Amino acid sequence: MSKKPFISVIMPIHNEEAYLLCSLESLKQIEDQIFEFIFILDRCTDNSEALVRRWFPDAKIVKKEICKWKNSIAENFQIGFEMSKGDIICLHDADVTTPRNMLSVLEELKNDVASVGLTLLTCKEASFLNRLYYYWEKTRRFAPLGEEPIGALRLIRRECLEKVGGFKDVIAQETQLDIDFRKAGYKSKVVTNVTCYHLRKFSFKKAVRSQIQAGKARKQIRMPFWRVLGHAVLRLRPFTLYGYLFKKEDDHHESN
């Protein structure tokens, strides 16, 4: 980009104190390059607020007690977007680390590119299951139609986000966002040379729940059955197919 942009970082938080400290510490490294920080405290009952105020005392903080949307994460991002002023919107999960060179991806945000996501890697040191998941993630490259942008940490041009009307109250809000961008003539991409780490510990129960939710999301956006089947087989995610075929999509109230 030709000039230094104003960047607004939006981070929704729902009882994330187990991972939040590492996330905030890494984000602090690029504080002088960020225009504003917006933290959405979504029904937090832990020590998350104190951590945010300690590390970012001048940040904008919203304490949300009631959810009006079915997907509270999507609602949190929309709240942050509406109160932000930056030219670039950075969507940042609370359990993800910020690389020092994150802003190098700004060069990709030009012409018809609306959104750039960083490559997300699982922190394999967190647990044995995390280590297995770390290596399983490499199957994403063999998924039908190739690797697609994912959430966790991405930067978006404000003008593009405004054009598509912001976030929608759907199960997979960022997948829907990419669909909206394509319909508006924009592209979303992921860079492989800048990575961030997912700190959360995995469990079998969480993995199954995540796959079922992903299947419901694919059904909601009317993804073709053949593609869901290929995804489930090639990436070893059988419960995605179960969620797509047998679960209703109407009740998708989610928190971070």
Language-model segments: what does each one mean?
Residues 25-34:
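Short, acidic, metal-binding catalytic loop of nucleotide-sugar glycosyltransferases
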Residues 41-50, 96:
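A conserved acidic beta->alpha catalytic loop
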Residues 87-97:
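Short beta-strand-to-loop acidic/aromatic patch adjacent to the donor-nucleotide binding site
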Residues 97-128:
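Conserved donor NDP-sugar-binding/catalytic core segment of glycosyltransferases
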Residues 204-256:
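Non-catalytic, C-terminal membrane-associated alpha-helical segments of glycosyltransferases
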Residues 35-44, 63-65:
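Short beta-strand/loop segment that forms part of the nucleotide-sugar
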Residues 67-84:
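Glycine-rich, basic loop-to-helix element that forms the pyrophosphate-binding segment
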Residues 123-124, 138-156:
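A recurrent flexible, glycine/aromatic-enriched loop bordering the glycosyltransferase active site
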